[in-house]
Amino acid sequence: MSDGSRKSGTKSTFHFVAGLGSGVLSAILLQPIDLLKTRVQQSGKHSLRAALAELRSSQQGLLPSLWRGTLPSALRTGFGSAIYFTTLNTIRENAARHLPSLAAAAPTIAAASGIVAPNANQTSSSLPKLSNTGNLLAGAVARSFAGFILMPLTVLKVRYESSFYKYTSLAGAARDIARTEGARGFFAGFGATAIRDAPYAGLYVLFYEKSKQHLSNLFPQPPQPQLSTTTTLEAAAGQDGGGRMSQSRAASINFASGVFSAIICSIISNPFDAVKTRIQLQPKKYRNMVQASRKMLAEEGVRSMMDGLALRMSRKAMSSALAWTVYEELIRRAEGAWTKRGPEEVQL
């Protein structure tokens, strides 16, 4: 396998499996926060304290109630992450290869002296590099595609978590939606979801990549001793492990970048999330994004657009940071094994 074909990225299977694993893990660990966010957003009168009191008084008790809806959440987040990361990597690879205007600038190498700054091209990632515009577009397109595919599971998850519906099983919930609303019911709120998720994902990838770059420069890894000129040049070009950080340093930078990016993007996109939740829970009362927004603002004021922000911000910060860190580390390991042994022997 040529270096060019190796640099095109790991097999899509690796990205799918890595995305699936990271998504399922984050969904299970953070399900209580997601459930509380849904309860707070389901009406303008709910507060976190009221939601917790309601869960404590339920027949199941507080702890089991906090993990209600874990299965649809894990399925949605797991397969959503798998589809998203696979699609994102495919878009970034093809954009880097075929669209020079979206590709990241190549690293500058002091060819005359053969010397580069020790930390100039260190990276915490093995993923394709794009320009700011490329990252913004790639993230938005990949998230919109994954969101459409997983929309039925999203509707089931939100309704299962809500106290408005007394579903006892996913199959029963699906039958009820199909009977009362038809196929359209499984895509309730997709417009608000797409408008929320596409900008969120695009901005997230943009901020995430820029944050990794800045943190890598702020906290450089000590240079390896006695590197030859050839090794140094290869490291700068990203052609071997010389341009990669240690596992712990890379994971720390990726996690911190994920938290920062999620907080910023959650604040920007929360109004769309609040509207989307109302549409999915009460489709007869909130028919579409424009009507729902007007009704919420007229009846409850601007504050209704920020319902659940603290919970959503907490969950997004942790879930995004965890998912991206686990995903990137699995891909780094796969890339390393690919380089050493060849693709046919690689196991995540």
UniProtKB/Swiss-Prot annotation:
Catalytic activity as recorded in UniProt: glycine(in) = glycine(out)
SUPFAM superfamilies listed in its UniProt record: Mitochondrial carrier
The keyword Transmembrane helix is annotated on this UniProt entry: yes
This protein's record includes keyword Nucleus: no
GO cellular component annotations of the record: mitochondrial inner membrane; mitochondrion
UniProt keywords, alphabetically: Membrane, Mitochondrion, Mitochondrion inner membrane, Repeat, Transmembrane, Transmembrane helix, Transport
Membrane disposition: Multi-pass membrane protein
Chief site of localization: mitochondrion
GO MF annotation list: glycine transmembrane transporter activity
Per-repeat ranges for Solcar: 10-94, 130-214, 249-333
GO biological process, alphabetically ordered: glycine import into mitochondrion; heme biosynthetic process
Cellular compartment(s): Mitochondrion inner membrane
Transmembrane residue ranges: 16-41, 69-95, 136-161, 189-212, 253-279, 308-326
PANTHER family membership: MITOCHONDRIAL GLYCINE TRANSPORTER
Function: Mitochondrial glycine transporter that imports glycine into the mitochondrial matrix. Plays an important role in providing glycine for the first enzymatic step in heme biosynthesis, the condensation of glycine with succinyl-CoA to produce 5-aminolevulinate (ALA) in the mitochondrial matrix.
Record family assignment: Belongs to the mitochondrial carrier (TC 2.A.29) family. SLC25A38 subfamily.
This protein's name: Mitochondrial glycine transporter
Organism whose genome encodes this protein: Neurospora crassa (strain ATCC 24698 / 74-OR23-1A / CBS 708.71 / DSM 1257 / FGSC 987)
